[in-house]
């Protein structure tokens, strides 16, 4: 099971944490895990290369933590578009595969 936690503060996504593996198929053939991994790495790359945002990304086997610490208004808005796009994509995958993904969204 992949657990994904998204923390939203003041309508901006500040933290995304992913842990676990989908285990929907054998290693190398797990399309759900591959999809989530691809979305996650694409998000990190887009936040740093497109939004030029100040982020902290901790990536290891079966675990990823992304913290968006951007204060600049324009970069913050770009970051928010990217992170909310990620959230919508993950929601879609979770709806189709609830036995492999659990998404928790916390809003303050």
Question: What are these model-derived regions, one by one?
Answer:
Residues 1-31, 41-108:
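N-terminal intrinsically disordered, cationic/polar leader segments
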